[in-house]
Each structure stands twice: as structure tokens, then as C-alpha cells.
Amino acid sequence: MTSVQEKTTAEIARQLILGRDLDVAFLIEKKDPATLYFALHSRKDLAPTSAVVRLIQGIYATEPEKSRVLVRNRIYTTAPLTTMDRGMIQVAAKRASEIHGNSELFEIPEKQVDLSETLNGLTSALEYENHPRSTLAGCDDKAWMAFAVQLTRPIQVSRESQPALFLSNRPVAAVLVSKTGELLEWALNTNAVNKTLHAELNLVQSFYRKFKTKLPAGSKLFTTLKPCKMCAAMLFDAAEDMRNFKVALEVIYGEDDPGPNARNTALENFQRQL
């Protein structure tokens, strides 16, 4: 009989990284068959993501039927947990630990799923052929917020026609406008199945995939609902100069969110309600 192979979390991480300049985040589903889900992330990558973010988003994208159970397992990561990581864990997962010579032992599952590149399949709203085009260049904040509200109409229609499928797709839209009043990007909340895909997060990640840059300094982000902890942290990280955030990005929201996930966020002193 072959003995069961056990390794510490630190040993598992080293095995997955293979000496490369990468961070890794992983969790283990212990049910039969046991599965190790992991995601790698380059420490030099400036994209608005991380090993933890890639792992959580990847699980929701690839395992929609059991994702909410999977993400309740503890996540282990070699990288220091950032505000962005903690925000996503609080909103869409359960718990995580940094690996510092961790001695906890696990049986190594034969089945291992690499989720590092899952996010590459997400599509920017502005890449759709029939997306709304704004002619509001130079208009005031109220006009841009009204445009954002208008964008939520497809979600409202979907909820009315298929309430069971779209019940958790709250009608929320986010709009990014340059300092000269040009529409740069917009996105909708699509979190019915993937709990991470809030409007602001969709916007930030799709903008980076297209332009490979942070959100332009002096731009404005309009969102129809006050950002939660996850989205606030993502926006804060995506700003061109976090040390001077008010200049880098102005965040303006419409409806207040009194829930616990929208309290004491990274944007607490850097956003205003319209």
C-alpha cells in the first residue's frame, strides 16, 4: 500500500511556484476526489489583480455550481494580503492566511486546477457591438450619473423577464470619464453567478486589459451604488497615484449602501454622493 503524501502549505507553495518569481494562492477541496485549486501571479505585474484575486475569481468562473462552497475553504498565499485581497475575501470568499513557514499538513490531491489565466476571458462592455455611446462630453456630473442609471436598464429588464436567474444581478452601472469629459469605459454588475463581478471591478479589470495602464489621473468614476469594500479597494489600487488619490480619481456614487460591506472602505474619505 502506498503511503499518503503529506506536505506543509509552504512546501505545496514551493512545488507550485517552481523557483519562479511568482506568488501563489491555493485552497484544497477535501471531498472525494480531493482537488487543489491554485493561481499564480507575477510580483512585477501591475494589473489590478493578485494571486488571491485570480484564485477567487477563477473558482467562480470555472465552478459556478459549487463555487460558493469552495471559497469557504481557507485560502493560503505566499503574498502579503493586500486591502484588495481582504476586500474580495470579505465579499466573495471566507478566510485566508499568509504562508510564513506554515506547518499545517495536507494530503496532496492528484487533481490540481490552475486558474491563473481565467480572467483573460472576461470581456469589456465597450467591446460589444451595440454598446451605448455617450455624447455627453463635457457635461456635468448629474448628466453622467443619469447616463449610468440608463445603462442599468438591461439588468432591470432581465430581472423582470427571468427573475430566478437574474435575482442577484442588482442594477448597478459604473462609468469612467476622462478629465476632458470623454467616456473611457463602462460596466455593469454581473454577479448573479460570479460574486466578484461587481460593476466597478468589471470596469477596472476590463480597462486594464485594453490599455495596460492604471486609470488616468484626473478621471471620474460614476457608480450608481456606493462601492463595497471589494470594489473600493480595487479602485484605490487602480488609481494612477494612490498617494494623491483625490487628484488621481474622483469617485461619485448615486444610491447609498447601508450594508456592512460598504462601511469603512478604502474610499471612505475619497468619495462623495451625488
Model regions and ranges:
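Zinc-dependent deaminase catalytic domain
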Residues: 1-274
